[in-house]
Amino acid sequence: MSDFLLQMRGIHKRFGLVTALDNVDLTVQPGEILGLLGGNGAGKTTLMNVLFGLYQADAGAILVQGQSAAIRGPKDALTHGIGMVHQHFLQVNDFTVLENIVLGSPLRNWPRLQLATARQRVQELAQRFGLAVDPDAPLADLSMGVRQRVEILKALYRDARLLILDEPTTMLTPQEVDTLFQSLRLMVAQGVSVIFITHKLREVLAVCDRITVLRNGRSVLTLARETATDSALVQAMVGDALDVEASLVFTGERRGPPRPVVGDATPLLVSTAVTISDDLQLPAITDCSFAIGVGEILGLAGVAGNGQRELAEGLLGIRPLVQGQVTLAGQPVRLGQTAHLLANGVAYIPEARMADGFLPRASVAHNLILGQHRQPPHSNGRWLNWRQIVARARQQIGEFNIKTPGPHAIGANLSGGNIQRVLLARAFARPLKLLVAHNPTQGLDLPSIEFVYQKILAQRATGMATLLISENLDELFLLCDRLAVLYRGRIMGILDRDHFDAYTVGSLMSGAHSPGQQQEAGHG
């Protein structure tokens, strides 16, 4: 009998000309939490998709309890006791918790009787592992933390002995993260093993027993938690591409002048009692008021889907206001005025980059001038200056480390991280008055994240105001001067930098405080 529950040996995987996994080795022991750490694009999710049967390896072997395992699909993985909770849940909103958990399981002969048995089993699993759920609750009414418990119970219901969690804390409040970690410890105490995929150092050091680091599709380091240090893990993740000791990402220390006091001058952007509807004409933002001063970074925290996108679009004239007013430099922002704003010192990095910020069939050079194509030096107002456009594109490709054959390459051939770099290069191509950035570092590796942070802080020093919308509290705490917290379309509070605290913000993110009280406190 092998000492390992799982062994992955020499795993290779290519997508066309791109090598995603290069001779990767990984082991998991019974009853342990293995942290799988790496930056964006390191190969973490690809490796786990191979293990779960969603991808087929080009070479290599998988052994479960010392025996070769042929995993050609998720059904084979489940047969071998391997379950996976994806970063984006696969659920049916119109079903109850119980119906989602048993969905896909055979219910023969007497479905009602079997549902009663399933209910009992789900309740037993929930109690054993600290995964409190109401089996009869409609899924659509539940928070992301409870939805995640449903996905974990779905795997445990199918007798998973090895549970893969892909970036499980991304959409959780700090309190929900603590609850998840408690459940994971209960699981390993009862013999379940866990592979915990993350790019966050703090998490692996808090909950994992061993840590394996991937970089550029290779396994470069495995350490026991007791011997792991922040600097060793960061160095393994990025190699020599980042000065660890001087890094904003690593040290968490922001350098630069303190923010201006907003009350000393007219704020640049003001939102007054704004209400905005979503695409179904349902309320997305309600009675939202705040101001951003010149040279200030205001963060917007909240679990995804609480109105962040609608607010950003309303502020920039992309989406109509149901009521209220937005002003920029004292002038009202009106619907349809977006192009004028973008041509006059405003930049927007949207959440849905492929839908709202990028043309996959156009060249990299085209994408780098979107919204700026009628302005010098790209144009004389009538004709495009392609020599200047291509020369400028080459400069931006180098400055922002966009991995592409050149300015004429088609955008569809870029990776997600490189598409994000194109959006960032376009945003910072000119002096800015206002930046509205929604998850600006998504899909980027650590050196690129560091580069973005430095760019934002450098522009802040010149007077640029920033609305930074992010689900990453570490990012918000590092960069922001003040922090607004959004819950179900309402601003629950606005905190000064001296009062940033993960648990206070987490409480606001879960709606624990009344909107009126917190808003007044935030502005006071």
Task: Report the location of each language-model feature.
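Glycine-rich phosphate-binding loops of nucleotide-dependent enzymes
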Residues: S2-G524
